[in-house]
Amino acid sequence: MEQPRYDEAKWPILLVTMPPEELAGPDLLLHMDRMSAFSKRGVQFVQVIDVRAASSLSAKARRLVAERMDQDEEVYPHILVGVAIVLATPMHRGIFKAITWLSRNPRPFEAFSEIDEAVIWARGLLRAQHSLTLPIAPDVTKRVG
């Protein structure tokens, strides 16, 4: 069975291309472990997941993915900044919505039809997140106060 491809060339944007066959059982668990490993690094990042050629996930698989994302958020808070999904069909959009509804932790989720659009969104999200977490320089606070 073909496995997902993980492309870190644009890190901290992670591009994941899902295979045509549905991931299930040990293959799905391996994929989720690999995705969790990116959070373990402790560096904020955005996932861009290309599912245009992928088959749909079962309801059980959708629940497992959402649960793992929630677990990762609890252990590594605010590391996964957002998720962009590149979709080709309305069926994929429905699966994507189901995963976002199943997740307990709010994070930006956005659907796109092209990878380039998703990467632009991911860059903007990281830029905005970075500007929110930058410390205020001491000389600026002196001038304001």
Language-model region placement:
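Amphipathic, Lys/Arg-enriched alpha-helical "gate/interface" segment within cytosolic domains
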Residues: 1-145
